[in-house]
Amino acid sequence: MMSGTPQFNPTDPTGGRPSHLRWYILSLLFFATTVNYLDRIVFSVLIPVIREEMHISNQEYGYINGAFQAAYTVGFLFMGRFIDRIGTRIGYAVAITWWSLAAAFHALTGSPLNLGFWRGMLGLGESGNFPAAIKSVAEWFPKRDRAFATGLFNAGTNVASMVGPPIIVAMLGLWGWRACFLVTASLGFLWLILWLMSYQLPHVHPKVSKAELDYIQSDLAEDSEEAKIGWLAALRYKQTWGFALAKFLTDPVWWFYLYWLPPYLYDVRGFNLKEIGWALPVVYLMADVGSIGGGWLPGYLMRRGWPHGKARKATMTMFACLMPIAAMSALAPSSVLAIALVSLATSSHQGWSANLFTTTSDVFPKNAVASVTGIGGTMGGLGGFLFSAIIPGFVVTYFGYTPLILGFGFFHLTALLIVHRLLGDMKRITL
């Protein structure tokens, strides 16, 4: 039996050396996800400065974020199906070109309305990242490695949130806030060159050895080609709804911290912009730990004989149970304790998310993964639109941050019940 750690022959039977190309492909997914989140967080890091220049209220800030979320929600539906139809290589390239152009145009805005428009355009493009990345993982990794691979590329969200703020603050001091958008947008075009030069499916890639291809295709029988399905057809399956409803409930928690943590630290905890720039990396470093650790744990349990569904749900249960503890950050008497508990929240969410994303490739064949991921992303975007953009703008204005932070502590536990009921033991379905 093949273990979770790849075993290669000393030499490739075809005469070449054993390759490890799937890890290079994964590094490109990590790079794209990092760029995706850099383009996304620039606005929230710079909002104290932009807010003063454009006189943006908390409610207007919520509406601007809502424009991103609404577009992201709609885009997810169509991007998933688009990527399943056109293929990962071209689909991913189209998505990153779109969002990089939209990110660059933020530099030309002069009013809240302009910002809202370009945030919406950014959301449409960025909605393609996760359907494409999840599909790439399904194409390049056997099932036992997919949660770990997902956790690794998903760590790009945290790396962006960790290294981005101090770099953005430094660029702000040197060149002003408009240049920050141009610099981060340019990274997408650099990635595009590397991607188009490198990405092909494993069985036709000239640099993949036979040993690596055999490993990638070790569960090929289970992943046999089936007819492509659209999102309307996918909605007939309760497993699709289990994934989508879990995304609806838990994605807003991450979005809330992404959007509102900088103004929370500024308005409530009294941080200045430089202090925010150094506090956020701590929060998202711990999110990296959760993402990678959460991806590694179910694979470890599977190698010890656990069924994959049981291993996946045990890991998700652990992270869901940590979220109410993390929500106590709203009541923390000191800023240090508050940052520690927020770090627990981001870490636990990312550990949860790495496993939730992987349920799509656990349960659905490869030809449906991007479509189902797109449906889930749409529901996650809808939840984010309501619970991290529109509602917080009102609640923060009239009641403060505390009710929101405490309430979000229980969203993952509710989602866990839905996952248990609708995804069950996470066995592969036949379309």
Regions found by a protein language model. Give the residues of each.
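Helix-loop-helix hairpin linking two adjacent transmembrane segments in secondary transporters
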Residues: 153-206
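Residue-level signature of mid-helix packing/kink "hotspots" within the transmembrane helices
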Residues: 41, 69-77, 161-162, 284-288, ...
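Cytoplasmic helix-loop-helix junction between adjacent transmembrane helices
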Residues: 118-158
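Helix-breaking motifs and short loop linkers at transmembrane-helix boundaries and internal kinks
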Residues: 55, 87, 108-114, 125, ...
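Extracytoplasmic gate region of multi-pass secondary transporters
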Residues: 43-44, 237-294, 349-353, 357, ...
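Structural signature of the two symmetry-related core transmembrane helices
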Residues: 90-104, 310-327
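A late C-terminal transmembrane helix in Major Facilitator Superfamily
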Residues: 291, 361-398
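Conserved MFS/SLC helix-loop-helix module at the cytosolic interface between two early adjacent transmembrane helices
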Residues: 74-113
